[in-house]
Curated annotation (Swiss-Prot):
Domain Fibronectin type-III: 678-770
Signal peptide boundaries: 1-46
PROSITE patterns noted in UniProt: CBM2, CBM2_A, CBM3, FN3, GH9_1, GH9_2, GH9_3
Keyword Hydrolase appears in the UniProt entry: yes
Source superkingdom: Bacteria
UniProt cross-references to InterPro entries, sorted A to Z: 6-hairpin_glycosidase_sf, 6hp_glycosidase-like_sf, CBD2, CBM2/CBM3_carb-bd_dom_sf, CBM2_carb-bd_dom_sf, CBM2_CS, CBM3, CBM3_sf
Region (Disordered): 647-688
Gene: celD
Protein name: Endoglucanase E-4
Catalytic activity: Endohydrolysis of (1->4)-beta-D-glucosidic linkages in cellulose, lichenin and cereal beta-D-glucans
Organism listed in the record: Thermobifida fusca
SMART domains tied to this protein: CBD_II, CBM_3, FN3
Length: 880
């Protein structure tokens, strides 16, 4: 789905002698009555309200989950793998690495650099918080990861690559990062089209990070400073707004321009180098920062975020120089966030959340909280010191769970946290659907969601609400830094066993199978390879699978043939002999890119027939075990990835289905006194007015004599039951039935010793005489999965004609005004209520007895009554 963000509005090594700041001309705080809302001036908790160290620990983990590129050996996120390995190839560079911005997969350099600067600032302000929480190594890993990317993105002094991936194309696909199918173009700024904002911000990030690495790795710190100097010179010399040059405007437009970054970047270079000329540059550029409309007051009714760093520079320069103009600007800004200025204050919810803007409101509150904590440490004004400190603690505690919902807004932390953030890889869909599966498959520990978008404390944990449930690297930036300062002040303990091990929620790459067409001289199987991988998501492009079978007595190996009427992989040709009477057929899907990225992309279908003439019996075939008339996991068909088994169990020599021994083992048939297991629950298909087909899963026999066959019984309504036939197969065709009549069928297994199993029964009703009849050319099964005003429809078409079709057209009419919104495996057209589906190139032909599956997403209102008037190439179809 497409997600477009609207415009937001939305102790350094070389510090000078410390000056405590006093607001000499500070105005008195506004009264609560003037504002009509409660003041955020209550005393903060003397003891920690939450385990801030745990929250910081999980926030560091979130940044690891956002990594792009080849992951390191110490990767802690079990559901993440290598991704974006071709980034930069379009421009002949290695631009791998860095962070994915949010729940999408674009690497936006502007917010990425801001995030790095804020994280580094937090470590500079409170190294003790990171050390006491045990998170300093993880912080440095994260900062090194992103700065390594900045180094790659800055191949020459006046060139900076600022974006990889196209936001519009990226947002049209919903799937995990490891299998992204779209092109990922690279975009740069240079003298011909400059970006002073992003270049100066990246300079700030590298300069601030160099301070964090200066003691441990001075050589790396020096490299960062060198790049920072070049980038700042580039930003200052060639002035321009980066979003005029790259397609980031719909996502991260530079609304505030580049003036704030010129101040911000110069300040951090001063802190990294001790060169006073950078401080002078910061102070000079400061005077050109924006002001409130029709005043000479610096802007104060917004806050520090990825776009505008002015507010951070108020505090940094006040702290560094002690000059009154910076102090006044910092006070006015933070007063607006606490007690108000000139009768105006940021809106507050009844529960105490400061709500600046709809999108990412908690992010803005957390950023402001961090800078307020920094400022509160260095000012002398006791009223403001307490006010700003307590405001900050209150906002962070609100995010952690101190709110009217008594719920955390940090994934995987605290009480009732969000479980379904708007994040493609954490969701783990394999069908390119934001709605499926219903719950996220992975826990995106530490991610701060956007939270309530209005000052009403209301929130719903809904992945499709991408305003309240968006997560992003910049959301956690000031939040992490504030947590470090609260750990330093209040303490806390990281979890000893974090992160917990995530186990897959089921088979990831597997084979399903069903009986496609029953026969007495052959076995015809429909097999479906599915790739639903998520630990991590991965491509299957060297897949093969094997179907093992036993050659029955009287069947000549030379008579065995294998064929395929419908195959999305390579056509099987040979039968392979293992030993004795054990053989297998191998289906080669090498070259087919099967990945968890869509309805069609995550699966491949193969219909194959193994024919051997009279005497053919699949009941003792290894791979036939458990296969019925509906697609279901087939654990005895073995799937390989480049020769390595990833699904299924292969037979050992001499082993037979059910665990029995091969020839020469077990008891003699006459000694068998154990009845076989009951057949699987019968299913009914191809129902007409006079016939139907029963299918069931094979019975097993542990007594040693083996299953001899099955007896089929039938009764109509309350009439008398009669035996209607016997078979050695797992299917039986019922004929001579009455139209519009309810029948009960029963299947009983018997072994070679005469033991009889329990009965398995099924009830069905034949069609009325006008319901398609025995001569219907096709059968259509139609099923839906409904939600709110939408639904997913699956259609299974079985062709019953005698001559193959080279192409086909399915037609039907919606009875209740439904609309097709997106389809797969066919080209869909709708004219009013009339719908037609025509094939893709790979499923255009239909052999007699073949089946094709198609589907679509749709919308409905009132009722979702299913269509019933299906035709195939103009001929009416029976309903399955």
């Amino acid at each position: 789905m497409s997600v477009t963000e609207p415009p937001p509005r939305r102790r350094g090594r070389h510090s000078r002698a410390r000056r405590f700041l006093t607001s000499l001309g500070a105005t008195a705080a506004l009264t609560a009555g003037m504002l009509g809302v409660p003041l955020a001036t209550g005393t903060a908790h003397a003891e920690p309200a939450f385990n801030y160290a745990e929250a910081l620990q999980k926030s560091m983990f979130f940044y690891e989950a956002q990594r792009s590129g080849k992951l390191p050996e110490n990767n802690r996120v079990s559901w993440r793998g290598d991704s974006g390995l071709n980034d930069g190839a379009d421009v002949g560079l290695d631009l791998t690495g860095g962070w994915y911005d949010a729940g999408d997969h674009v690497k936006f350099g502007f917010p990425m650099a801001f995030t790095a600067t804020m994280l580094a600032w937090g470590a500079i302000e409170s190294p003790e918080g990171y050390i006491r929480s045990g998170q300093m190594p993880y912080l440095k890993d994260n900062l090194r990861w992103v700065n390594d990317y900045f180094i790659k993105a800055h191949p020459s002094p006046n060139v900076l690559y600022v974006q990889v991936g196209d936001g519009d194309a990226d947002h049209k696909w919903w799937g995990p990062a490891e299998v992204m199918p779209m092109e990922r173009p690279s975009f740069k700024v240079d003298p011909s089209c400059p970006g002073s904002d992003v270049a100066a911000e990246t300079a700030a990030a590298m300069a601030a990070s160099s301070i964090v690495f200066a003691d441990d790795d001075p050589a790396y710190a020096a490299t960062l400073v060198q790049h920072a100097k070049q980038l700042y010179t580039f930003a200052d010399t060639y002035r321009g707004v980066y979003s005029d040059c790259v397609p980031a405007g719909a996502f991260y437009n530079s609304w505030s321009g580049y003036q704030d970054e010129l101040v911000w970047g110069a300040y951090w270079l001063y802190k990294a180098t001790g060169d006073d000329s950078y401080l002078a540059k910061a102070e000079y550029e400061y005077d050109f920062l924006s002001t409130e409309q029709q005043t000479d007051l610096r802007s104060y009714r917004w806050t520090i975020a990825w776009d505008d760093k002015s507010y951070g520079t108020y505090v940094l320069l006040a702290k560094e120089t002690g000059k009154q103009k910076y102090i006044d600007d910092a006070n006015r800004w933070l007063d607006y966030w606490t007690v108000g200025v000139n009768g105006q204050r940021v809106p507050y919810s009844p529960g105490g959340m400061a709500v600046l803007d709809t999108w990412g409101a908690l992010r803005y509150a957390a950023n402001t909280a961090f800078v307020a904590l920094v400022y509160a440490k260095v000012i002398d004004d006791p009223v403001r010191k307490q006010r700003y400190h307590d405001f900050a603690v209150r906002q962070i505690n609100y995010a952690l769970g101190d709110n009217p919902r008594n719920s955390s807004y940090v994934v995987g932390f605290g009480n009732n946290p969000p479980r379904n953030p708007h994040h493609r890889t954490a969701h783990g869909s394999w069908t390119d659907s934001i709605a499926s599966p219903a719950e996220n498959r992975h826990v995106l520990y530490g991610a701060l969601v956007g939270g309530p978008g209005s000052p009403n404390d209301a929130y719903t944990d809904d992945r499709q609400d991408y305003v309240a449930n968006e997560v992003a690297t910049d959301y956690n930036a000031g939040f992490s830094s504030a947590l470090a300062m609260l750990v330093e002040e209040y303490g806390g303990t990281p979890l000893a066993d974090f992160p917990p091990t995530e186990e897959p929620d089921g088979p990831e790459i597997f084979v399903e199978a069903q009986i496609n067409t029953p026969g007495t001289t052959f076995t015809e199987i429909k097999a479906m390879i599915r790739n639903q991988s998520g630990w991590p998501a991965r491509m299957l492009d060297k897949g093969t699978f094997r179907y093992w079978f036993t050659l029955d007595e009287g069947v000549d190996p030379a008579d065995i043939t294998v064929s395929s009427a419908y195959n999305q992989c390579a056509t099987p040709e040979d039968v392979h002999h293992v030993s004795g009477d054990l053989y297998y057929v191998e289906i080669d899907c090498t070259g087919e890119k099967i990945f968890p990225g869509g309805q069609s992309e995550h699966r491949r279908e193969v219909q194959f027939r193994i024919a051997g003439g009279p005497g053919w019996d699949p009941s003792n075939d290894w791979s036939f075990q458990g296969i019925g008339n509906e697609l279901a996991p087939a654990p005895y068909i073995v799937l390989y990835d480049d020769g390595v088994p990833v699904w299924g169990t292969a037979p050992e020599e001499g082993e037979e289905p059910g665990g029995g021994e091969g020839p020469g083992g077990g008891e003699e048939p006459g000694e068998d006194v154990t009845p076989p297991s009951a057949p699987g629950s019968p299913a009914v298909r191809d129902v007409t007015s006079t016939s139907a087909v029963l299918t069931w899963s094979a019975s097993s026999d542990t007594g040693g004599s083996g299953v001899a066959g099955y007896d089929v019984f039938l009764r109509a309504g309350t009439g008398q039951e009669q035996k209607v036939g016997s078979t050695t197969r797992t299917s039986f065709t019922l004929t001579g039935l009455e139209p519009d009549t309810t029948y009960i069928a029963a299947v009983v297994a018997r072994d070679n010793a005469g033991n009889v199993s329990q009965r398995s029964t099924v009830s069905f009703t034949t069609l009325a005489e006008n319901g398609g009849g025995p001569d219907a050319s096709c059968t259509v099964g139609y099923s839906t999965n409904d939600w709110d005003s939408g639904f997913t429809a699956s259609i299974r078409i079985t062709y019953h004609g005698t001559a193959p079709l080279s192409s086909w057209e399915l037609s039907f009419t919606f009875p209740a005004g439904q609309q097709v919104t997106h389809g797969w495996n066919a080209t869909w057209r709708q004219d009013g209520a009339a719908v037609t589906a025509t094939p893709m190139s790979w499923n255009s032909s239909l052999a007699p007895g073949a089946t094709v599956e198609v589907g679509f997403n749709g919308s409905w209102s009132g009722s979702n009554t299913p269509p019933t008037d299906f035709t195939l190439n103009g001929e009416p179809c029976a309903l399955a």
